[in-house]
């Protein structure tokens, strides 16, 4: 193939074929690069080869098939020689004794070790995985090779990954200027947004700042919800009106924060400094929302004389219209309900995997005392009168607790339901 730009980068090895790695590898292959996609999960590799994706992402299957059919994308379980290596592996958070969390870099370091035998002088390594500040530099210092290393954090939203891979601005931080410029050469082959280059420490911090900002905003909304529950105000109405101010943009409250970014990344700042007390407080507030929801549900049921209830959970994924259950608040809500003697069934038409059993809709609601909505799937938003009429006879008690404010409450009330809304103290 012809080389791209000023640097002789023709072959790229992408390590990790998950939510970020597979779309990135496929995008590069469809833009002319010779790409080897690597994943240690042999089952996943075979599924990709056979066009059987477990990632529910619009347009991804077509993109992957196009890349494989063009012969530009080959997937395998081991690394190989290349001009550039892109690491797209998870960086989960590990719990610490003091109640905080820290970044688990084991997947990143395993990826580095896997490619090390194939890395030659002059090669480029790009780390897309979200990492704490100073990590890129430390990895470079351990390699003892004349290579280039950069950090280009992913910045996409599940459900819109392909669109945002192309349209979003990107930041690339290098351990030196040439590292950043080499990485930029690769990404500008498909990125239509602006690409900003800086040093690796800054790039690492920028990604963490972006998600920390959102986490803190959500924590503020959740604290407002708790206050409004106490003082007799509907927080949703209050936020809507407050946001009419041109310099106010409060996000919505909910049962907690999940996913692989917002619920994790702020901890990577906290672990680096003692000056992140506000960030830690926000993170802890959001982590405690499942307990608040659990206690609110059980308290309301107890007021109605319902002990040891059967509860129907609507939603296992961490956000609407995706199949991703990583760090989902639903897990902790269910865990706490079970610990408090409730029987719990869970319905989610999107989730492909969950720590707790998933039921059909009929199984979930049969004999139930209460429906608790935890995820804002469109299928829940669009429940209409006829659907409610079908649900009613299967329930033991007509109670619904909406933590996302997505149901048409008037329809449920007309059907005889008691409707409870998170953050609505004006019940």
UniProtKB/Swiss-Prot annotation:
<dbReference type="GO" id="GO:0051287">
    <property type="term" value="F:NAD binding"/>
</dbReference>
<dbReference type="InterPro" id="IPR036220">
    <property type="entry name" value="UDP-Glc/GDP-Man_DH_C_sf"/>
</dbReference>
<feature type="binding site" description="in chain B">
    <location>
        <position position="245"/>
    </location>
    <ligand>
        <name>UDP-N-acetyl-alpha-D-mannosaminouronate</name>
    </ligand>
</feature>
<feature type="binding site" description="in chain A">
    <location>
        <position position="39"/>
    </location>
    <ligand>
        <name>NAD(+)</name>
    </ligand>
</feature>
<feature type="binding site" description="in chain A">
    <location>
        <position position="130"/>
    </location>
    <ligand>
        <name>NAD(+)</name>
    </ligand>
</feature>
<dbReference type="Pfam" id="PF03720">
    <property type="entry name" value="UDPG_MGDP_dh_C"/>
</dbReference>
<dbReference type="InterPro" id="IPR036291">
    <property type="entry name" value="NAD(P)-bd_dom_sf"/>
</dbReference>
<dbReference type="InterPro" id="IPR017476">
    <property type="entry name" value="UDP-Glc/GDP-Man"/>
</dbReference>
<keyword id="KW-0560">Oxidoreductase</keyword>
<dbReference type="GO" id="GO:0089714">
    <property type="term" value="F:UDP-N-acetyl-D-mannosamine dehydrogenase activity"/>
</dbReference>
<dbReference type="GO" id="GO:0016628">
    <property type="term" value="F:oxidoreductase activity, acting on the CH-CH group of donors, NAD or NADP as acceptor"/>
</dbReference>
<dbReference type="InterPro" id="IPR008927">
    <property type="entry name" value="6-PGluconate_DH-like_C_sf"/>
</dbReference>
<dbReference type="GO" id="GO:0016616">
    <property type="term" value="F:oxidoreductase activity, acting on the CH-OH group of donors, NAD or NADP as acceptor"/>
</dbReference>
<dbReference type="InterPro" id="IPR001732">
    <property type="entry name" value="UDP-Glc/GDP-Man_DH_N"/>
</dbReference>
<comment type="function">
    <text>Catalyzes the four-electron oxidation of UDP-N-acetyl-D-mannosamine (UDP-ManNAc), reducing NAD(+) and releasing UDP-N-acetylmannosaminuronic acid (UDP-ManNAcA). Cannot use NADP instead of NAD.</text>
</comment>
<feature type="binding site" description="in chain B">
    <location>
        <position position="247"/>
    </location>
    <ligand>
        <name>UDP-N-acetyl-alpha-D-mannosaminouronate</name>
    </ligand>
</feature>
<dbReference type="Pfam" id="PF00984">
    <property type="entry name" value="UDPG_MGDP_dh"/>
</dbReference>
<feature type="binding site" description="in chain A">
    <location>
        <position position="318"/>
    </location>
    <ligand>
        <name>UDP-N-acetyl-alpha-D-mannosaminouronate</name>
    </ligand>
</feature>
<feature type="binding site" description="in chain A">
    <location>
        <position position="211"/>
    </location>
    <ligand>
        <name>UDP-N-acetyl-alpha-D-mannosaminouronate</name>
    </ligand>
</feature>
<protein>
    <recommendedName>
        <fullName>UDP-N-acetyl-D-mannosamine dehydrogenase</fullName>
        <ecNumber>1.1.1.336</ecNumber>
    </recommendedName>
</protein>
<feature type="binding site" description="in chain A">
    <location>
        <position position="207"/>
    </location>
    <ligand>
        <name>UDP-N-acetyl-alpha-D-mannosaminouronate</name>
    </ligand>
</feature>
<dbReference type="InterPro" id="IPR014026">
    <property type="entry name" value="UDP-Glc/GDP-Man_DH_dimer"/>
</dbReference>
<keyword id="KW-0520">NAD</keyword>
<feature type="binding site" description="in chain A">
    <location>
        <position position="319"/>
    </location>
    <ligand>
        <name>UDP-N-acetyl-alpha-D-mannosaminouronate</name>
    </ligand>
</feature>
<dbReference type="InterPro" id="IPR014027">
    <property type="entry name" value="UDP-Glc/GDP-Man_DH_C"/>
</dbReference>
<feature type="binding site" description="in chain A">
    <location>
        <position position="91"/>
    </location>
    <ligand>
        <name>NAD(+)</name>
    </ligand>
</feature>
<feature type="binding site" description="in chain A">
    <location>
        <position position="20"/>
    </location>
    <ligand>
        <name>NAD(+)</name>
    </ligand>
</feature>
<comment type="subunit">
    <text>Homotetramer; probably dimer of dimers.</text>
</comment>
<dbReference type="InterPro" id="IPR028359">
    <property type="entry name" value="UDP_ManNAc/GlcNAc_DH"/>
</dbReference>
<comment type="similarity">
    <text>Belongs to the UDP-glucose/GDP-mannose dehydrogenase family.</text>
</comment>
<feature type="binding site" description="in chain B">
    <location>
        <position position="326"/>
    </location>
    <ligand>
        <name>NAD(+)</name>
    </ligand>
</feature>
<feature type="binding site" description="in chain A">
    <location>
        <position position="44"/>
    </location>
    <ligand>
        <name>NAD(+)</name>
    </ligand>
</feature>
<feature type="active site" description="Proton donor/acceptor">
    <location>
        <position position="207"/>
    </location>
</feature>
<feature type="binding site" description="in chain A">
    <location>
        <position position="155"/>
    </location>
    <ligand>
        <name>UDP-N-acetyl-alpha-D-mannosaminouronate</name>
    </ligand>
</feature>
<feature type="binding site" description="in chain A">
    <location>
        <position position="214"/>
    </location>
    <ligand>
        <name>UDP-N-acetyl-alpha-D-mannosaminouronate</name>
    </ligand>
</feature>
<feature type="active site" description="Nucleophile">
    <location>
        <position position="261"/>
    </location>
</feature>
<feature type="binding site" description="in chain A">
    <location>
        <position position="258"/>
    </location>
    <ligand>
        <name>UDP-N-acetyl-alpha-D-mannosaminouronate</name>
    </ligand>
</feature>
<feature type="binding site" description="in chain A">
    <location>
        <position position="404"/>
    </location>
    <ligand>
        <name>UDP-N-acetyl-alpha-D-mannosaminouronate</name>
    </ligand>
</feature>
<dbReference type="GO" id="GO:0000271">
    <property type="term" value="P:polysaccharide biosynthetic process"/>
</dbReference>
<feature type="binding site" description="in chain A">
    <location>
        <position position="156"/>
    </location>
    <ligand>
        <name>UDP-N-acetyl-alpha-D-mannosaminouronate</name>
    </ligand>
</feature>
<dbReference type="Pfam" id="PF03721">
    <property type="entry name" value="UDPG_MGDP_dh_N"/>
</dbReference>
<feature type="binding site" description="in chain A">
    <location>
        <position position="19"/>
    </location>
    <ligand>
        <name>NAD(+)</name>
    </ligand>
</feature>
